[in-house]
Amino acid sequence: LTDAPQPVRLVTCSTAPNPRRVNAFLIEKGVEIPKEEIDLATRAHYDPAHLDKFGTHHLPALELSDGSTLTETMAICRYLEALHPEPNLMGATPLELGRIDQWNRRVEFMIMLPAAYVFRHSHPAMATLEVQEPVMSEWHRRPLAKGLEVVEARLRASPFLAGDRFTMADINAYIALDFMRVTKTRVPEDHTATLAWQASLADRPSLQRYVPPAA
């Protein structure tokens, strides 16, 4: 795909979970893209010029060499996988493609989404960005707990979420579980398979938390 438009700029906030997922993907691929870091508190991603360029405030946002753009985490990763097929992270066989997508979706809807609702409606840092409803926070803790049970059951049967090797599904799940810390939610102690899986990945360079450079 040498004639395909190439990435020229990634607008991101590397401390946030969705940008972290793309960053992890890039590190696993050994690919570097120039980054423009945004502080979410400044709301620079709501600037009219940004919205006109990308069509949404969602981060990360990828600009390509022909001027076209991509947003949404998995869309960006799928494009990058097509440009850089190895190491494969999104599926090498039809069944693996399906399983990785299946677990990506389960993690997003059963862990990442409810954790985001808990965070947005309970964390003091979000009070200036969200009309907080405490009942929303408490309600979403229940599906979040169920999502953790689903992941635990899978990891008791498989070394990784989508099978016998590390894939994008594991990147998504690891970062989703790490994001839960801001909601004061932890993986239960009796979820031994999940805790062992987390420990096995904890030193992986791609999964380290981003530390902003000192001012």
What are these regions (language model features)?
Residues 1-138:
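GST-like domain detector, emphasizing the conserved glutathione-binding G-site
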Residues 2-3, 104-203:
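GST-like fold's C-terminal all-alpha helical module
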Residues 210-215:
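Terminal-tail/helix-coil boundary detector
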